[in-house]
């Protein structure tokens, strides 16, 4: 989003039309995959609930889309004007560091004591994006769940995913 937003207005519109438009000169992308919080492609690492070391926010009261309000969210809105039927999948690269066993965004895993809170993080994300006019059509519990070497990243084995999903599903009810 940051790179696309750095283009001139004309070049940006040309690119967005070429990618998401429906005319003969467009490739008509119909499905996007975006990160929940930062990915390894972002200029800086962030979650939507960053806290100082030692603090926790079980109910996600400090949750905020602020890190993406400058680039990603405005860009998604522009894409939706071009293609209002586009489907969006959202996937995290890491839980907020305070939820992880090593308290950092690199590697490690989600601490089981925070499964319920992390499920609420997903719910808050879907709700917050909806208030921005962006519908998230699908989610995944973790990007590259067995690769924990990027910044951000998080190991989430199949067994961990099963345990977490058992909390995630009911959180959406």
Describe every region a protein language model picked out:
Residues 1-136, 162, 166:
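N-terminal catalytic cores of secreted or lumenal carbohydrate-active enzymes
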């Amino acid at each position: 989003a940051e790179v696309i937003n750095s283009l001139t207005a004309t070049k940006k519109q040309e690119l967005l039309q070429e990618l998401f438009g429906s005319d003969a000169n467009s490739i008509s992308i119909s499905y996007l995959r975006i990160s929940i919080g930062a990915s390894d492609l972002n200029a800086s690492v962030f979650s939507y609930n960053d806290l100082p070391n030692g603090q926790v926010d079980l109910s996600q009261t400090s949750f905020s889309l602020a890190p993406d309000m400058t680039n990603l969210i405005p860009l998604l809105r522009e894409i939706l004007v071009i293609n209002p039927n586009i489907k969006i999948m959202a996937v995290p690269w890491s839980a907020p560091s305070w939820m992880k066993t090593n308290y950092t965004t690199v590697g490690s895993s989600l601490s089981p004591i925070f499964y319920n809170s992390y499920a609420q993080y997903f719910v808050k994300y879907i709700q917050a994006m909806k208030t921005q006019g962006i519908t998230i059509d699908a989610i995944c519990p973790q990007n590259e769940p067995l690769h924990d070497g990027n910044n951000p990243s998080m190991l989430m084995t199949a067994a961990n995913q099963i345990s977490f999903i058992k909390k995630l599903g009911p959180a959406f009810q």
